Amino acid sequence: MSRNITIEMLNQIPVQDQQIELVERKCLGHPDSIADGIAEAVSRALCNTYIDQFGGVLHHNTDQGEIVAGESMPKFGGGKIIKPIFVLLDGRATKEFNGEKIAADTVALKAAKDYLRTILPELNLDQHLIMDCRLGTGSTDLRDVFKPEAGQIPRANDTSFGVSYAPFSDIEKCIREISSYIDTTLRPKYPVYGTDIKIMGLRQGNTIKLTICCAMVDRYVSSLSDYVNYREKLAEEALKVAKTCTDKKVEVSVNTADCDIECSLFLTVTGTSAEMGDDGSVGRGNRANGLITPHRPMSMEATSGKNPINHIGKIYNLLSNELAHTCVEKVDGIAEIQVRLLSQIGSPIDQPLVASAQIIPKPSFTVKDIERDVYEIIDSGLENITSVTERVIRGELKTF
C-alpha cells in the first residue's frame, strides 16, 4: 500500500542564516531531565520484564512522573540535606496478564533507583530520597488498540504527530558537544561539576553567547576562591569545545547569578537543584533531539516514558528526527529540512495520515532535484518503523 508522502519547498531563510537564534539544553541532572530519565528507565525496564515473562511488550505508559524538591544546607567542604527529594512514579502499566500477576511497581521502583545512582552519584538514596509508585492500569479502549497481532504492524494509539528537522546549526552543535564533553571528559576529572547543568545559547548575527548554569558539589570546594577557579575552568573548557564547532565568535558565561559570597553561589550537596527548591516534570525539558529550540518546529509531547510499540508521541518524534538527519547526510542539496509525521488512531503506524517533508534547497538546487531521494528515505524509514521500537528497548535511542 502506497504512503501519503508529500515533499515541498519551504520558502524561508534557513535558521542558521537568520539574525537571532535561541537554543537550550537541560542536562542529565536538571530536575526536568531527571524526571524524563526516570520515566524512560522505568518504561524500558517494564518492556524487558514483559518480554522475559510473556515474550512481548504489554501496554504501559510511564510519562507522568514528578520530582518534588527537598531542602538542603550546602557549604564549603560539604553540607547536608535537610528534607529528602520526593519522586512520584505515575502512569499506566499492565499488572496482570493471562491470569499471571506482574510485579510492575517493584520493577519500576528498582529501575528508577538504579537510574538515579548513575546520574546522581552524590545522592544517598537511603537518606536523601523518598519514592512512591502510583502506576495504574490503562483504559480498555487503548489497551485493545495496543494488542499486537502476530506479524502485524502495531496500530496508532492516538491521532498525533511527530516533528523534527536537520541539520543542526552551529549553536546547536556547540551546546550538544559541550554537554557531552562535560559528562564524558570533564566531570570524571573534576567531580565538583554536578550533573544539573543548563546551557542557554543566543546567536546574534555571527556572535554566539552561551550562559551555563552548573551546580557545584560542595564537598569538592574548599573556599570561595576555589569555587571561582572551578567556575573559570568550566568557562575555559566550554569555550574550547565550542570553537571546534563553529568559526563564529563565542562568549561563555558561567553561573552569572553568583554574588561571590558563600550564601549566594550555585553550591549544592548532591549536584542537583532538586535538593533545594527546583521541581521537575516529565516532558517539560528537552525534545527528542536533546534540545529546546524555539526557532524550530517542535512537538509538545513528552517522548520519555511512552510505550515504544504504538505511542505516536514517542515513535514519530524519534523517527522524524532520524529521517531528517538521514536525508541531509545522504542527499545533496538540502540546506534545511523539516519532517512531520501525522498518525490516525487505530491505523497502522507505518501508514501515517501524512508524512510531510519541507525543504529549503541549497543554491543551484531545486526541490525537484531532491524529492525522489527524500521520498525513498522517508518511505524506507516507515517500512522499517518497528526498528525504532527495538532500539528504544535496547536503550540505543535517546529521548531527551
From Swiss-Prot:
Its cofactor is Mg(2+). Keywords: ATP-binding, Magnesium, Nucleotide-binding, One-carbon metabolism, Transferase. ATP binds at G136, T137, G138, S139, T140, D141. One of its GO terms (biological process) is S-adenosylmethionine biosynthetic process. InterPro entries: AdoMet_synthase_2_family, AdoMet_synthase_3, S-AdoMet_synthetase_arc. GO terms for molecular function: ATP binding; magnesium ion binding; methionine adenosyltransferase activity. The keyword Glycoprotein does not apply. It is an enzyme of class 2 (transferase). The keyword DNA-binding does not apply. Pathway: Amino-acid biosynthesis; S-adenosyl-L-methionine biosynthesis; S-adenosyl-L-methionine from L-methionine: step 1/1. It catalyses: L-methionine + ATP + H2O = S-adenosyl-L-methionine + phosphate + diphosphate. Gene3D superfamilies: 3.30.300.10, S-adenosylmethionine synthetase, C-terminal domain. It comes from the Archaea. Its EC number is 2.5.1.6. Belongs to the AdoMet synthase 2 family. Catalyzes the formation of S-adenosylmethionine from methionine and ATP. This is S-adenosylmethionine synthase.
